[in-house]
């Protein structure tokens, strides 16, 4: 680990780290890794964890700091065997914390992308602030979410999609998650979920609820040589929105390019945020069934848009992918996948497969 190479005189302490953060100073190399290791091993106290989580968010973390946090978390995670599924899979996940209580757009988009033939390795959790997170909704649909590493890999290999339930794969994170729940406000830990997929997929459509931190996340993905679209709806959503424009940080070949994206340019009607609002797990599961069953409207539009975004990100693994043609192809594929019934069939197959395990 980075912190293991610190000189003896530089050995971090909580007062030195919290002192730097609370005076707005960036941490030195290895200090964020040391702090995260203390948290993941259960050495840090709840007060130290809370102080670190809030102070880091207020200071505004750098990509280097967040990379250290994510790398330590992955070091402690249960690994999904990528010799079975490779790493050219795609994740579709957001930070949460946008407060909008929308239906589970990324979950629906993930099913559509998998049905379009691109392997999906989704990482997710129960709701932190909304009524129903991706895990809650999948459970209501009948997908087993408590699978271990080999079972998740088998699901990707057999069905084309797998779900890594964060609690199952990051057992050492329990020390931080209890504090996070008690705090009830966004912290630096909100950024870590999308950055710590235990299968380390190389492609992703990653939503960030905070525009000022989206670029930080993009920097982490750039250092991993990923092909990722980090997206922030200009209405505050941690998804590609259909109510207005979105800002996209396009990560490809180690570079980050910031773009403004207007779905109207591809023929999408402006939606009202109220049309995208969800409810509890049963309500959101019913929305999934309706959209995959062909129901038209604002939710379907948002699902098609986000599924296309993930297809564009995956296409970006090939260096010759062109932006507008990739979007046109992605939107056509996402639409066809729903209209042909392929997405609906894939969900049914996924439920059957996981229930047999």
Curated annotation (Swiss-Prot):
Residues binding 5-phospho-alpha-D-ribose 1-diphosphate, per UniProt? 94, 97-98, 102, 104-107, 122-130, 134
Listed under GO biological process in this entry are: L-tryptophan biosynthetic process
Q: Which ranges does the record mark as transmembrane?
A: none
Q: Does the keyword Metal-binding apply?
A: yes
Q: What is its EC number?
A: 2.4.2.18
**tRNA-binding is among the record's keywords:** no
- In which residues is anthranilate 1 bound? 94, 125
Q: Which residues bind anthranilate 2?
A: 180
Enzyme class (EC, first level): transferase
Keywords for the protein's UniProt record, in alphabetical order: Amino-acid biosynthesis, Aromatic amino acid biosynthesis, Glycosyltransferase, Magnesium, Metal-binding, Transferase, Tryptophan biosynthesis
Question: Which residues of the sequence carry a binding annotation for Mg(2+) 1?
Answer: 106, 239
Q: What is this protein called?
A: Anthranilate phosphoribosyltransferase
